[in-house]
Amino acid sequence: MLRILHIVTYMGRGGLETMIMNYYRNIDRTKIQFDFLVHRQEKADYDDEILSLGGHIYHMPMLNPFSKAYFNALDDFFDNHKYDIVHSHLDCMSAYPLKIAQKHGVKVRIAHSHSKSQDKNLKYPIKLLSKHLIPKYATHLFSCGKEAGDWMFGGNAYTVLNNAIDAEKYRYDCQIRNQVRDELKISKSDFVIGHVGRFNPPKNHPFLIDVFKSVHDKNRNSKLLLVGTGNGQSNIREKVDNLGLSNSVFFLGNRGDVNSCLLYTSPSPRD
């Protein structure tokens, strides 16, 4: 059996994690299996499903390119676990685990770009340096799109691997539409917009709320559904309250039925 190691931050219900799970559910798991190397200790949304599908989850310390303990942990891991393919989803920081995978003889080492930019914070210079190391240690470069590939890999050749979804799940279904509206006590005539994303700066929630305020001013029967969690949620709740939108904006947390919504908006400049 071919075993592939996916290297991620953790398997929460985010975009890249959901993309991996879409593939995982549909591959022939008698021939191919996925394992996961994660960089958080807490249990994540997809952990139980991964285990039920036959995968393993291994925990690493938080990624730190200046930490000898981190690289020692990677060395210990690859000393004791052999893989045919290692597939890293850490964007700019993929260079570091792929370097150790190369050291331990992993022949296929994939770096996958899922974003067309990074936050310009204190870590930004480190990330810029790190992304230039990726072609040295990766044998294959994948990207979710052209902009993400150009930003991450520059002039190096890469393969665009479009994020796949099960299209049947997203077909219009009047019964599902009515069930969700009944659950949320939303009128069947209301105009509903959905958004899925973690409450952090790249997802651009403040701009989304401003846009929705303009929509709501023109149509008082409009509703905004926000799916996701994150440290910035309290600030967005405060903004919603200050704009008088509390009865029209729904904070739904993490959900597994985002396909139930018919209209979505994505204001992130990185997606």
Model regions and ranges:
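Short His-centered aromatic/hydrophobic patch
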Residues: S88-S94
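N-terminal strand-loop element at the rim of the active site
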Residues: L2, H6-A69, G230-Q233
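A conserved mid-protein helix/loop that constitutes part of the nucleotide-sugar donor-binding site
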Residues: G14-N22, F191-S214, N231-R237
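Active-site donor-binding acidic/aromatic loop of nucleotide-activated sugar
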Residues: G232, S246-G256, C261
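A conserved, positively charged/aromatic
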Residues: I110-S143, M152-F153
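A short helix/loop element that forms part of the nucleotide-sugar donor recognition site in Leloir-type
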Residues: R171-I186
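Conserved small/polar residues in nucleotide/adenosyl-binding loops
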Residues: Y264-D271
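Carbohydrate-associated surface elements
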Residues: E147, A164
